Design a protein with these regions (language model features):
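Generic beta-sheet signal
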Residues: 83, 112, 154-157, 181-182, ...
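Small-residue (G/A/S/T)-rich helix-start motifs and N-terminal tracts that mark the onset
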Residues: 1-81, 188-337, 343-352
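Nucleotide and nucleotide-moiety/phosphate-recognizing core
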Residues: 38-125, 133-155
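Short, conserved active-site loop motifs that form the nucleotide-linked donor/cofactor pocket
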Residues: 106-107, 176, 200, 291
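Short, small-residue-enriched loops and turns at beta-alpha junctions
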Residues: 89-90, 128, 317-318
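Internal gly/pro-rich beta-alpha loop/helix module
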Residues: 119-120, 125-216
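Short low-complexity, flexible loop/linker segments enriched in glycine and/or proline
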Residues: 96-99, 168-170, 282, 287-291
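A short, aliphatic-rich alpha-helical micro-motif
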Residues: 115-119, 172, 303-304, 329
Length: 352
């Protein structure tokens, strides 16, 4: 299982880790920087002598992660420079602490940095939680980073991407890879954010499920191996392995019904019945002969037969599809219902 968190959820888990679990913020920042350093070393340690890293650091804790990363890379023998973007007087306390420490390491920090001399660009401007369009010198910095030809790495979330929705807020850093901290952010898997994030690595920085304190993220995905199918009874038969009823496929959309039926069988259903337009009968019976067939007129009498009901794939937006939806949701079978986008369209048309 992979959790997909919002900015608000991530901030709460970060706070819980610090205040309730007793892991200090600077420790979390150091671990974030170590995770980013590990990623860079995996890619570039073999060519360290030819690798020059430029980090664009904002004034928040994401920028602090960038400063800590600069220190670690410099200590490991990399050529590193930091370009600060923003008003240092408004920097966070952790940022200021990292900045003071960085002065003892061979890291270039002056304003006259030739960006095109560097072949690894690190975005540490904003991180998670950006909610306003990127403007002014921040937008200039993003555009400057995007114009370089080097490898581009984002820390936590590419600057300019809404971490909740994946929307581009004005302009955004186009990364080759993103190292995100703690849990994956929704905006890294939703487009267009996923395209801007590139390869995504979720790093363990010490913020784990213990930080939920009873409030788990609302969204997650199943990974390979997360779903374990039940072991089938050797003495069972197709009637004991579950019955799936599919309301799918308007006239001319029989393919959607066939694909849905095949998916039901592949995920373990013993019997599958397809309720579809009468014009699709021959195509479906040829395409998946093991499935049962029923017309829309037979829907009501089929509801009690099913253990699970799916409605939506390819049913279109005609009156007949709407009547099928009403038949299902007005019955006791609605508790066994899964749906698709078309289902949501009809629900909205009924309610609004």
């Amino acid at each position: 299982m992979k959790y997909l968190v919002t900015a608000q959820e991530m901030k709460q888990y970060d706070k819980n880790t610090i205040e309730y679990l007793g892991i200090p913020g600077p420790v979390l920042m150091e671990r974030a920087a170590l995770a980013a350093e590990d990623f860079i070393k995996e890619r570039f340690d073999a060519v360290k002598e030819r690798t020059k890293v430029l980090i664009f650091a904002g004034m928040g804790n994401n920028g602090g992660d960038g400063l800590a990363l600069a220190r670690l890379l410099a200590a490991d023998g990399y050529a590193v420079a930091v370009k600060c973007v923003g008003d240092m007087q408004r920097a966070t306390n952790q940022w200021k602490s990292q900045w003071q420490t960085l002065q003892h390491f061979p890291v270039k920090t002056d304003s006259n940095i030739a960006v095109d001399e560097y072949n690894v660009i690190v975005d540490a401007l904003f991180g998670v939680g950006l909610s306003r369009p990127v403007e002014g010198y921040y937008a200039d910095a993003v555009k400057e980073m995007n114009m370089t030809e080097g490898f581009k790495l984002a820390l936590d979330v590419p600057s300019g991407i809404c971490s909740d929705t994946g929307r581009v807020l004005g302009c955004a850093f186009l990364a080759d890879a993103t190292v995100t901290f703690g849990f994956c952010k929704r905006g890294l898997v939703l487009y267009p954010g996923a395209e801007y994030a590139g390869e995504v690595r979720t790093a363990n920085v010490g913020i784990g499920p213990e930080s939920f304190l009873g409030q788990e993220p609302e969204m997650y995905t199943y990974e390979k191996g997360s779903v374990q199918l039940l072991k089938r009874n050797a003495a069972g038969n197709k009637g004991t392995f579950g019955k799936a009823l599919l309301v799918a496929g308007s006239n001319g959309m029989a393919g959607a019904a066939i694909l849905a039926a095949k998916a039901a069988y592949r995920t373990g259903a013993g019997m599958v019945k397809v309720i579809t337009a009468e014009e699709n009968r021959q195509i479906i019976q040829q395409g998946i002969p093991e499935a049962l067939y029923g017309s829309c007129r037979q829907l009501a009498e089929s509801l009690d037969w099913a253990d699970v009901i799916a409605i939506g794939p390819g049913i279109g937006r005609e009156e007949q599809a709407l009547q099928c939806l009403k038949t299902v949701v007005s019955s006791t079978a609605s508790s066994r219902l899964v749906s698709s986008v078309q289902f949501c369209f009809f629900v909205s048309s009924i309610l609004f």
